[in-house]
Regions:
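Hydrophobic helical membrane-anchoring modules
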Residues: 1-9, 193-270
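Structured catalytic core of nucleotide-sugar glycosyltransferases
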Residues: 1-142
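A generic fold-level signal
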Residues: 5-7, 44, 166, 174, ...
């Protein structure tokens, strides 16, 4: 069923939520990348573009079904409801792990440079890397607020003791070997970019420039960013727990002293 490291089966895993405007455009780019890599002899023709419909309310799933009928390289799965970006990525990875040699997860909006996949595959084939992180070399397309909050977020995570790759989101290559180890994680609050380094296999990074969104609007508002940040901090670091525990001990100690003081005052007053 599987190919070899020299001719691996690649599954490109793409989470989709209400992407009817951008999907008809980027789907062609993903297919072209697959066919180009096959033509160059870098991957097997059994490679696929795997779309994960995350409970979309628009025509996203209908478009995915039409794509699957149009070309064998397109396949899709659909979640029964919207479970969030991280869960959608994980669902795609788990769907692919027994069918491929490597996966590359990437968003549907076209902001991540698809051409970086060539270097990712090369790092797997030639250098034996099991994980390859896509790292943004520039964030010129982001607003000042987003750049500032992103930088602060990474600094906070590192200060909390979490191991994360700076300027890396969810654009990465993972081998099937890594995916099978990753399947053993039972984390409820998913923060994939922090969980992947914990697996511990040989890794490297590939730099790329981030583009403007090709079409449609972002489905990742500030509220979701804050929620992801909270999940990252609470799931990867014990420092918040230690802080809360220490604070609780101090409060309990002060309360105990207060009670003793009140008893003494009452006895002296009597």
């Amino acid at each position: 069923m599987k190919a070899t490291r020299e001719n691996p089966i690649l599954y490109i895993v793409i989470p989709c939520y209400n992407e009817q405007e951008v999907l008809p455009i980027t789907s062609k780019l993903f297919l072209k990348k697959i066919t180009d890599l096959v033509a160059a002899g870098k991957i097997s023709d059994d490679s696929r573009v795997l779309f994960v419909n995350d409970g979309s309310k628009d025509k996203t799933w209908s478009i995915i079904c039409d794509l699957a009928k149009s070309d064998k390289h397109y396949i899709g799965i659909s979640q029964s409801r919207n479970r969030g970006h991280q869960n959608a990525v994980l669902a795609g990875l788990m769907e692919a792990k027994d069918k491929c040699d490597i996966t590359i997860s990437i968003d549907c909006d076209g902001q991540d440079d698809i051409n970086a996949m060539d270097a990712m595959v090369d790092a797997y084939v030639n250098d034996g890397c099991e994980v390859v992180y896509g790292v943004r070399s520039k964030r010129d397309t982001d607003t000042f607020f987003k750049r500032f909050t992103a930088e602060s977020f990474y600094k906070l995570l590192n200060a909390m003791g979490a191991e994360v790759v700076y300027n890396h989101a969810d654009y990465r290559l993972m081998s099937a070997r890594v995916l099978h180890e990753f399947a053993n994680f039972k984390e409820v609050n998913l923060f994939l970019r922090g969980m992947v380094p914990l697996v511990g296999f040989k890794s490297t990074s590939v730099a790329y420039e981030r583009h403007e969104r090709i079409a449609g609007e972002s489905h990742y508002p500030l509220s979701k960013m804050l929620s992801l940040a909270f999940d990252g901090i609470t799931s990867l670091s014990v420092k918040p727990i230690r802080f809360i525990t220490g604070f609780g001990v101090i409060v309990a100690l002060i309360s105990f002293i207060g009670v003793i003081w009140a008893i003494v005052e009452a006895l002296l007053g009597a």
